[in-house]
Structure formats: C-alpha cells, structure tokens
Design a protein with these regions (language model features):
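Alpha-helical scaffold segments
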Residues: 1-83
Length: 83
C-alpha cells in the first residue's frame, strides 16, 4: 500500500531533521544537495564532512565550526579540501 500524502510529508520531515537519514537521503535518493536539511546535517561532524565531500563536493564553510568539534572528521575534511 503506498504512503498517503500526509504520511509522506511526516516521513520527509522526520528524515530531514535527522542528520544521518538526511545525509543518506540526499546522497542516495535525491542525488543532490538538500538545503532544507543542511541546518540539521551541519551540526553532526561526521555527516557534515560526508555531505561536503559526497554531496556538495566542495568546502562547506557554514559547517566547518561543527566539523572542527571532531579531530578525526576535521582531519578528513582538511585532507580533502585543505585548511
């Protein structure tokens, strides 16, 4: 049975506000950036870094303060884009 439109909207809202789900949905389903989910994605160092490298494919200055919260993800980000 297909999702009803109301359920679809609720599900998208749930995905959008979850950094992990939003990253994978953007990368694997939408296959493009998802500006509405970016405020949620950027607050998680791992998914912010992965979103920059896999979806945006460029530096993401707005997310850098959050990425820097994790030495590991900061290192990955800087290896890809420089300091």
């Amino acid at each position: 049975m297909p999702l009803k439109p109301a359920n679809y909207k609720n599900r998208i809202q749930e995905i959008k506000t979850n950094p992990e789900k939003a990253f994978f949905y953007s990368r694997d389903v939408m296959k493009t950036r998802w500006p509405e989910a970016e405020p949620y994605i950027m607050k998680h160092p791992a998914y912010a870094c992965l979103y920059a490298t896999d979806v945006l494919k460029k530096k993401w200055p707005q997310a850098e303060p959050y990425i820097k919260d994790s030495a590991y993800w900061q290192s990955k980000y800087e290896n890809k884009f420089g300091k």
